[in-house]
Amino acid sequence: MARQQTKKNYSLRKLKTGTASVAVALTVLGAGFANQTEVRADEAKKMEVKESEKESQYKTLALRGENADLRNVNAKYLEKINAEEEKNKKLEAINKELNENYYKLQDGIDALEKEKEDLKTTLAKTTKENEISEASRKGLSRDLEASRTAKKELEAKHQKLEAENKKLTEGNQVSEASRKGLSNDLEASRAAKKELEAKYQKLETDHQALEAKHQKLEADYQVSETSRKGLSRDLEASREANKKVTSELTQAKAQLSALEESKKLSEKEKAELQAKLDAQGKALKEQLAKQTEELAKLRAEKAAGSKTPATKPANKERSGRAAQTATRPSQNKGMRSQLPSTGEAANPFFTAAAATVMVSAGMLALKRKEEN
């Protein structure tokens, strides 16, 4: 009985051991199938994530290339702005110089006008004095002519009296009283002749003085007329120079106004382009955020799929695989820190604002190129 009981117990233990072995084998076989299914799903998700990452990296490289191009365009645009500002400074300097020359010429014209007025006054005064001198000269000429006529008449009368005196003296036919009277008349005639000669000499001297004064006034008049003509020529040349400077000043002001209008127009275009590019930058940022969200969803799905087998009981091989699978999300986290989801992680310079500025510079450069 004891031996039979022992055999029975041994058989039961053997049966239990076999059953347990079969259960273990079935468990291992089921785990193998599950692991194969899980590995295939992981590989598909890995490929999808890799494709998405490759596409993001490609877009990043393309955007970096566009970034470099836009930087070059921006640099050229800045060079053009600097050149325009330098041109503006030169035009302002020319405008200032032309204004100074204009004011100097205006002062010179005013001085010449004043000198011309002074010469006109002097010329009028000289002309009036010349007219007075001419009238005096004509009056003296008339007096001199009258004096000469009177002198001739007195000489004729004196000769007549001399002849009569000589005749009376020779003939002794006249009385002493008549002789004395004739002598007195002769003496008076001689005195009148001397007085008339003195007056004649004085008139002759005055006439010569007036003639000299007249000659001097004539010379002064000629000099004044020459100066007036020269001054008129200088004034005309100054006016022509003033017109030329005024024309150059007007042209410089027109160029400066055109440059200011171009500058205002450029500012307006820049503002419009900035608004457009802000909208484009916003859309680009939204697109990047959407792609980032999709990548995050894929990573979350992958992480959830890799954590599920770790909760089932298994042997050392299965637990090792589960541990290996559990380490993958941390690796994906490291990879995620290197992916340009928003541009800041992989490349701190590549931000949405920087992309907006670069795109705006590129659009502005293209528009200016089309206008040119």
Swiss-Prot record:
Modified residues (Pentaglycyl murein peptidoglycan amidated threonine): T342
Signal sequence annotation: 1-41
Keyword Coiled coil: yes
Record GO cellular component, one term: extracellular region
Biased composition (Basic and acidic residues): 125-169, 226-246, 260-274, 295-304
Propiece span(s): 343-372
Protein name: M protein, serotype 2.2
Organism: Streptococcus pyogenes
Gene: emmL2.2
